[in-house]
Swiss-Prot record:
This is Lysostaphin resistance protein A. Its main location: membrane. It comes from the Bacteria. It comes from Staphylococcus aureus (strain NCTC 8325 / PS 47). C-terminal region not involved in glucosaminidase activity of the SagB-SpdC/LyrA complex. Pfam families: Rce1-like (PF02517). Residues 372-382 have a biased composition (Acidic residues). It is a multi-pass membrane protein.
């Protein structure tokens, strides 16, 4: 992400603080389950812990935009595609589980399908709310933070381990806890792949998958009452689907790479085979910008110096030409014959005209030097040329006026002598 990037220290502290607050709140909120009077299979109060932890971290730590980058609520075609997968994958897991029950246990349990103490709609709404608050914290917030320094695959592993610890169930023994850990970790890995490359639009996908899984398991299996075979079937089924889905995704992207000869980063941002090195990329980009700015400044300085040099030379040439004009006029002293005076006057006019032409040519030469500079510096060069050109024009006009006065004076003197 291009942004005010989270430093490595803040990144680690954010993950640590989130996990500590989540675990502490999950312990403290257990006592409130009986107080609010809601059954745990409808809504688990401890599931509020990730949501509260995410809100606290957003308020405490800086770079709010980076922290909220995974909390977008817009819809895209990719989101719709992943939403369909979020409904299909739980169905595949449940089908594998039911087939396993029919094969190895002769039947599967349709738990509490009759004689429920609450309507099914209440259970559905409760599971959607539970899925939203949990995934808001773990997927939309925590996984987004972890992915700022890791790619999706390793970020999913980190978040999966934390989620498995949060969801650990040691009530029914070590073996049950081990299969429950496998189930929740595989569950989290599937979710990490589902929300990959969705550009922060994660909450719909994660909530849909989570609610579909928990709602189906409530009715079809009895793992929540400690049945070891049920949790074993669910864990293995979920792990098989996780390996198959992630492996198939990698194969498809690998085929796309072989056919297009483009790397996976071009096909999908934040891929498994490319580690995110935001700090190094930022430093490299800043170094390139600074070097280009230095080169532009050097070019501008050279162009300005050359322009000033041309203007200065033109001014010196104009000043140096003035004495020659005066000397030429002084040589036109009255002669013994009017014809000689007229010829000298014509010579002076010719000299003045030739000097004007040369000066004009020198003025034309100055803009030619502008072609050597960049287009962005043309205004500065024209501004620097404006004052020397005006000065030269004033000097030439004064020289011409002096010459005309001198000619008139010599003509008057010659006419007086003739009289």
């Amino acid at each position: 992400m291009k942004n005010n990037k989270i430093s490595g220290f803040q990144w680690a502290m954010t993950i640590f603080v989130f996990f500590v607050i989540t675990m502490a709140l999950s312990i403290m909120l257990r006592d409130f389950q009986s107080i609010i009077g809601v059954k745990h299979f409808i809504f688990e109060v401890t599931d509020l812990a990730p949501l509260i932890a995410a809100i606290i971290c957003i308020l405490v730590f800086k770079y709010k935009k980076v922290q909220l980058a995974g909390l977008k609520f817009s819809i895209s075609l990719k989101v719709i595609e992943r939403l369909l997968l979020a409904l299909i994958l739980p169905l595949i897991i449940l089908i594998i589980g039911m087939y396993s029950f029919n094969t190895f246990a002769d039947s599967f349990i349709l738990l509490q399908s009759t004689g429920l103490s609450v309507p099914i709609t209440h259970i559905l709404i409760g599971h959607i709310l539970m899925a939203f608050v949990v995934e808001f914290g773990f997927r939309s917030y925590l996984q987004n933070i972890v992915e700022t320094k890791m790619n999706t695959f390793f970020a999913s592993i980190v978040v999966g381990l934390m989620y498995s610890v949060f969801s650990a169930n040691t009530t029914y023994g070590t073996e049950f806890a081990a299969y429950n850990f496998l189930y929740t970790f595989s569950f989290s890995m599937i979710l990490g792949e589902l929300i990959r490359a969705t550009k922060g639009r994660t909450i719909y996908i994660a909530t849909t998958f989570h609610a579909s899984m928990t709602f189906g398991l409530i009715f079809l299996f009895s793992e929540e009452i400690g049945d070891l075979f049920s949790i074993k079937v669910i864990a293995i089924s979920t792990a098989i689907v996780a390996v198959g889905y992630i492996g198939l995704s990698l194969i498809i992207r690998g085929i796309a790479y072989l056919t297009t000869r483009r790397n996976l980063e071009e096909l999908e941002p934040n891929n498994y085979l490319d580690h995110v090195n935001d700090d190094e990329e930022t430093n490299h980009t800043e170094a390139e910008k600074s070097s280009s700015n230095i080169k532009d400044a050097e070019k501008t300085g050279v162009a300005t110096a050359s322009t000033v040099g041309v203007a200065k030379n033109d001014t010196e040439n104009t000043v140096a030409d003035e004495p020659s004009i005066h000397e030429g006029t002084e040589k036109t002293e009255p002669q013994h014959h009017i014809g000689n005076q007229t010829e000298s006057n014509h010579d002076e006019d010719h000299d003045i005209t030739s000097e004007s032409v040369e000066s004009a040519e020198s003025v034309k030469q100055a803009p030619q030097s502008d072609d050597l500079t960049n287009d962005s510096n043309e205004d500065e060069i024209e501004q620097s040329l404006k004052e020397p050109a005006t000065y030269k024009e004033d000097r030439r006009s004064s020289v011409v006026i002096d010459a005309e006065k001198h000619i008139e004076k010599t003509e008057e003197q010659s006419s007086d002598k003739n009289k």
